């Protein structure tokens, strides 16, 4: 009778909320952070699932673009520079992360148009 409680029925295998929602990010941990963070007195059951899904989507989006930047630079490992290039070259991500500084990210290459040499028309 091992694995059975008082009711006599076998206990089903525990299923995480992340796997129920089809997510990789930990729903339970997000729920704990929402409760401990003093954001509200009470946290609904769907809130951590939704937030974990949003975090997972944003992470996947940034990593996709950073992987493309790494491949363009002929590198197999994503470094902070690739994250910076990915975020700053994407209009929506740049707006979302406008006030964020990425350590060791560098700057985007940019030369103002007025500093470029003048185009002279050669007449021959």
Swiss-Prot record:
PTM annotation (Phosphoserine): residues: 2
A Gene Ontology cellular component where this protein is annotated is: nucleus
Q: Where in the cell is it found?
A: Nucleus; Chromosome
Where N-acetylserine occurs, the residues are 2
- Post-translational modification comment from the UniProt entry: Monoubiquitination of Lys-119 gives a specific tag for epigenetic transcriptional repression. Phosphorylation of Ser-2 directly represses transcription.
Give GO MF terms, alphabetically.
DNA binding; protein heterodimerization activity; structural constituent of chromatin
Segments of skewed composition (Basic residues): 1-18
Q: Does the keyword Iron apply?
A: no
Looking up PROSITE patterns in the UniProt record yields: HISTONE_H2A
The lineage's top-level taxon is Eukaryota
Q: Please give the residue positions where the record annotates the modification N5-methylglutamine.
A: 104
Region ranges (Disordered): 1-21
Known function: Core component of nucleosome. Nucleosomes wrap and compact DNA into chromatin, limiting DNA accessibility to the cellular machineries which require DNA as a template. Histones thereby play a central role in transcription regulation, DNA repair, DNA replication and chromosomal stability. DNA accessibility is regulated via a complex set of post-translational modifications of histones, also called histone code, and nucleosome remodeling.
Q: What protein name applies here?
A: Histone H2A, embryonic
What high-level taxonomic lineage is stated for the organism?
Eukaryota, Metazoa, Echinodermata, Eleutherozoa, Echinozoa
